[in-house]
Amino acid sequence: MAIVDDDPRIQELLGAELTDLNQPHCSYSSADALLGDINNSQPGLIFLDVLMPGMSGMECLKHLRQQSFGGAVVMFSALNDAELQQQAEQAGANGWVLKAALFDDVETILRRYLTQS
């Protein structure tokens, strides 16, 4: 499992939630860092922030799908933007969660997407 967000607080909070649920994970502060390590870490599920400096989460998602990454990718954002959600879905995202609801939905996300992997 991987967490990709430029905000270390989100990495820490989501990481703690996953640790509490006995889910091993890696955290990355950029899309480039994830893509550079994807073959080593081989996560079954990626929590991917949409808006990050450098390569955006959306561009990262496109790279992952072009590289035939078969795991689930759940995008998250502070923005409740229907157009961005549609773009993410078209690019191959498995889900979309608002950051405000992310921590409440972690168990549901794990049940839904880890069983599909």
Can you annotate each of these PLM segments?
Residues 41-47:
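Active-site beta3 strand of CheY-like receiver
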Residues 59, 80-97:
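Alpha4 helix (beta4-alpha4-beta5 surface) of REC/receiver domains from two-component response regulators
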Residues 29-30, 56-59:
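Acidic catalytic/metal-coordinating carboxylates
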Residues 8-26:
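Two-component/phosphorelay signaling modules centered on CheY-like receiver
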Residues 83, 101-111:
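C-terminal output helix
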Residues 36, 58-69:
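Short amphipathic alpha-helix used as the core "switch/output" element in two-component signaling
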Residues 52:
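Receiver (REC) domain active-site loop signature in two-component systems and cognate sites
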